[in-house]
């Protein structure tokens, strides 16, 4: 099993090129199922989840070719299979996005329920409710969600029970080929939804309102090919800005968009950091200062993103002062805190709130990653801790951060990936 070995502490400074956003690349790759002509995507990050998505597409009969400079060529004109199988879906919850484009274009589709996810637990039920309102018949059989419709889906007014990025994307994709007009109310507003809508419109869809809480989709009969550049990853950007803030460094993130990160930049400035913005870059200069503690409350976009919560937990455990972090989006998203406590952090969890008491130094330790964002916070903790930190289960990081050790090494990190023997 692969692990990271980090020898801290050190200052992280320099320039980093930001990759394409995983959270835009995945739905856009699945949305390419809707196209009857070839599609070319650029700025597609080289990640485990992208690799899994490509495997699912190929299983359906889509021709997918990787090209230079993170380009992907997709031809979905000869799809001959309508089932996304368990052996691929089990590793990635985002696989549910295959269902809506399949049923919209081919009037049928089957997707294995993502591993450990029953209908009603996560918002998989909202994806299904949206398709049902558009006329699909949904059955659950032997662990597979099966969707069928006679003829085309029908446009509908769909009011989301709660703000859900995944369900908003599913309904938006399905509605592009539906008969009539669909409105999504209480829609998620994330930049990745906007990027997916731009991609679909390039293929001939008629979508307005993406980025607001009401999206309108006028159905069309077919979608064609296009070229599209994936939006930069705002979460990767925020992660590297935090890396500079906690290590006393100065980092410039190139090829990114500040207007997708307003809530994060505001909190970094509140923490005492100097943040300068251009059209395509963000620079954070810590001025060699220890950050001030900042209170965080995660919210749907444009509020503070849940995917930056773990990184700001780390910032707060080494900040000057005491802070509260309230997680309103996901349950069980404080699993990094016990690991940070092993490194000398002082924090306690009360329900959906963590209270952090800043300490001046962390100590290296053996820690275990539990999910994608928690894992990167542990790696960054190792960068500022005294001594050696070993981070286990780093496959989580490879799901969402492209070339992470290379990028950190260029900023001054002493980090290496190594293979450890499997231990019972």
Curated annotation (Swiss-Prot):
It comes from the Bacteria. Keywords: Cell cycle, Cell division, Cell shape, Cell wall biogenesis/degradation, Cytoplasm, Peptidoglycan synthesis, Pyruvate, Transferase. Pfam families: EPSP_synthase. Pathway: Cell wall biogenesis; peptidoglycan biosynthesis. The active site is at residue 117. Gene3D superfamilies: Enolpyruvate transferase domain (3.65.10.10). It is found in: Cytoplasm. InterPro entries: Enolpyruvate_Tfrase_dom (IPR001986), Enolpyruvate_Tfrase_sf (IPR036968), MurA_subfamily (IPR050068), RNA3'P_cycl/enolpyr_Trfase_a/b (IPR013792), UDP_GlcNAc_COvinyl_MurA (IPR005750). GO terms for biological process: cell division; cell wall organization; peptidoglycan biosynthetic process; regulation of cell shape; UDP-N-acetylgalactosamine biosynthetic process. One of its GO terms (molecular function) is UDP-N-acetylglucosamine 1-carboxyvinyltransferase activity. The modification 2-(S-cysteinyl)pyruvic acid O-phosphothioketal is found at residue 117. Phosphoenolpyruvate binds at residues 22-23. Its EC number is 2.5.1.7. It is an enzyme of class 2 (transferase). Its main location: cytoplasm. UDP-N-acetyl-alpha-D-glucosamine binds at residues 93, 162-165, 307, 329. GO terms for cellular component: cytoplasm. It catalyses: phosphoenolpyruvate + UDP-N-acetyl-alpha-D-glucosamine = UDP-N-acetyl-3-O-(1-carboxyvinyl)-alpha-D-glucosamine + phosphate. Cell wall formation. Adds enolpyruvyl to UDP-N-acetylglucosamine. This is UDP-N-acetylglucosamine 1-carboxyvinyltransferase. It comes from Glaesserella parasuis serovar 5 (strain SH0165) (Haemophilus parasuis). The lineage of its organism: Bacteria, Pseudomonadati, Pseudomonadota, Gammaproteobacteria, Pasteurellales. The gene is murA.
